[in-house]
Regions:
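Acetyl-CoA-dependent GNAT
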Residues: 21-94, 98-99, 111-113, 117, ...
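Conserved G/P- and acidic residue-centered "switch" motifs that form tight phosphate/ATP-binding loops
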Residues: 105-107
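Short, flexible helix/strand-to-coil boundary loops that buttress conserved ligand/catalytic motifs
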Residues: 34, 141-142
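Glycine-rich ATP-binding loop(s) of histidine-kinase-like ATPases
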Residues: 102
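Conserved N-terminal entry element of GNAT/NAT acetyltransferase domains
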Residues: 2-25, 163
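C-terminal "cap" of GNAT-fold acetyltransferases
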Residues: 124, 128-136, 141, 147-163
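Residues at or immediately flanking beta-strands
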Residues: 18, 91, 125-127
């Protein structure tokens, strides 16, 4: 994967941002961002506080170039991670946006970037295990629900985006 950065406008109004691969030195800061973003959702807060081990960004994903950050004004405001699936498709394994920059297009740009990377690797679909609180976001990004199941945090959605 090329380490080149892409500059993209958010929502046509926001300043330019950079989407780039994460670096190992950012791991702790990204996990802290994940926690802040996760605690915004009151429906997940109690379960997350009972299971702090859920906040984990494997270093292997970062060193493999599978974690992407969005920088705005030099600050990281969101990140995503992808993993290869056994069926040849790609899983969106993480998607977190700073609470103060949510609903500004950061998450959508990360999904679009991950879809582009997955397509370049030969995947035909991008999959995600979605939280019901994020259902409308993923549907707006083009995902469809292909199943439902229970997780240790409550209900989960299996979703797929054709590439």
């Amino acid at each position: 994967m090329a380490a080149a950065c892409r500059r993209v406008p958010l929502n046509g109004y926001s300043p330019l941002v950079i989407i780039r691969p994460a670096i190992p030195a950012e791991r702790d800061a990204l996990e802290a961002l994940q926690l802040r973003a996760s605690l915004v959702n009151e429906g997940d807060r109690e379960a997350l506080l009972r299971h702090p081990d859920a906040i984990d960004l494997p270093m292997e994903q970062i060193t493999a170039g599978a974690v992407f950050v969005v920088e705005q004004h030099g600050a990281v405001v969101g990140f995503s991670a992808i993993v290869a699936r056994e069926d040849g498709d790609t899983e969106l394994d993480a998607l977190f946006v700073e609470p103060g920059t949510q609903r500004q297009g950061v998450g959508k740009r990360l999904v679009e970037h991950c879809a582009k990377v997955a397509r370049s690797k030969g995947s035909t679909c991008l999959h995600v295990v979605g939280n019901p609180h994020a259902e409308q976001f993923y549907l707006a990004c083009g995902f469809s629900i292909i199943g439902r199941f229970d997780t240790r945090f409550g209900p989960g959605l299996l979703m797929r985006l054709p590439l």
